[in-house]
Amino acid sequence: MSKLRLLFIKEAQASYISHLDLLRTFQRAFPRTELDIKHSQGYHPHPIISIVLPLPVGQSSDCELLDFEVTQDTDGRGIAEKLNTGMPSGLRVLDCYPATRPVRDLAFLRADVTFEYDNGVPAGAAEALTALFTRPALVIQKRTKRKDLADVDIAPMIQEVHFLHGAHAVTGTVVVQAQNPGLNPQLLEKAIAAHLPALTPDFTRIRRRELLDASGNIFR
């Protein structure tokens, strides 16, 4: 038996595929690999696969990970090519390899963030946003698992921010906590609306670039 991990890109139209539909897409694709995927027990067995740190709908990523098990011994070579033969536009498997690192080692994520302004970027926006996201405390309202609103200080979850001022957008890179607890970079827009409403963007784009361990090394 082998535990394997896929590295894949999710972008363009595929960024709007829900988590459940993404799982179904891979479940339909696995027969092309000719691997014997480990299945659940019961009346309706299905392939046991899990996506590491599922991506919020509407965001794109260069570093999505999916874990699964097969009954035979394999190192995963050649699997990516077989899966890509029938993947929908915007999904592309880059690699398949043994899943040696536990998911608990995943600590941070690096993402590109673009805050777009239809009428041009307000003066001093990049500097003001940098100051906002480096505050010692930054409280926003966030929905809990019970769907209630609660005040949450997201400042401890923000590790790095770098922003540049453009004509119609502020672009930058952020490193935020990935889990226990994790911070969805989309919530940065909510923090802007709450604390610097004049700088609230008209649209926000997020692209996840890398998953990192606690030492800042790339997690695979």
Name what the model sees in each region.
Residues 134-220:
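Core RNA-modification/binding signature centered on pseudouridine synthases
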Residues 13-15, 23, 27-32, 36-41, ...:
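Short Lys/Arg-rich amphipathic alpha-helical segments
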Residues 2, 7-9, 13, 17, ...:
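Extended, well-folded interaction surfaces typified by the phenylalanyl-tRNA synthetase beta subunit core
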Residues 8-10, 68-74, 113-119, 174-180:
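Short beta-strand-to-loop capping motifs
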Residues 78-87, 123-135, 188-189:
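Short amphipathic alpha-helices in soluble, non-transmembrane regions
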Residues 15-20, 73, 77-78, 123, ...:
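Ordered, soluble secondary-structure elements with a strong preference for glycine-centered loop motifs
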Residues 37-70, 100-102:
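Short, charge-patterned binding micro-sites
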Residues 62-114:
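Ordered, amphipathic secondary-structure segments that act as subunit-interaction surfaces
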